[in-house]
């Protein structure tokens, strides 16, 4: 009996990545292992104010993920994540869970997405304790006081750190 060819698993991991953190990078690394192809998608919300413009966030993501052969970076706007996942042919949506409130929100979104397209599976990952509290808003909040550079450096990838230094010069 012949083995059936395995359908390629492709994931989409979306966020604002403003800025990209080591927590995001952990998620991307796991996604690159789980899926044959992973699209890291910067979602653009026209009602949200960003620290870095879209093009800069895309550049930082590309620089930080260039060592992954199966990871691509893109952006989308004015559409739901599930619609974007359908558009690019993703079989899975990858989401990170850091807290109970993250879980409650993501569970609700998973249920809604399942109603819209049950063929796209949502995968939840929980980051290790050492980076579970790291968020873009936390990083933004650390920037400014004397010595911020030393503290922030451990929470962001090198390309992001260099841009932060440049933007604060």
Question: What name fits each language-model region?
Answer:
Residues 1-169:
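Nucleotidyltransferase catalytic core that binds NTPs
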């Amino acid at each position: 009996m012949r083995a059936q060819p395995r359908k390629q698993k492709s994931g989409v991991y979306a966020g604002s990545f403003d800025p990209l953190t080591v927590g995001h990078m952990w998620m991307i690394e796991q996604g690159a292992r789980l899926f044959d192809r992973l699209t890291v998608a910067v979602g653009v919300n026209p009602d949200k104010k960003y620290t870095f413009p879209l093009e800069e966030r895309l550049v930082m993501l590309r620089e930080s993920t260039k060592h992954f052969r199966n990871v691509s970076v893109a952006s989308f706007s004015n559409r739901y994540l599930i619609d974007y996942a359908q558009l690019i042919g993703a079989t899975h949506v990858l989401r990170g869970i850091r807290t109970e409130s993250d879980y409650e929100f993501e569970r609700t979104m998973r249920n809604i997405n399942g109603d819209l397209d049950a063929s796209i599976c949502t995968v939840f990952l929980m980051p290790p304790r050492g980076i579970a509290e790291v968020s873009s808003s936390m990083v933004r909040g650390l920037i400014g006081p004397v010595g911020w550079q030393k503290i922030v450096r451990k929470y962001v990838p090198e390309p992001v750190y260099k841009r932060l230094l440049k933007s604060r010069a």
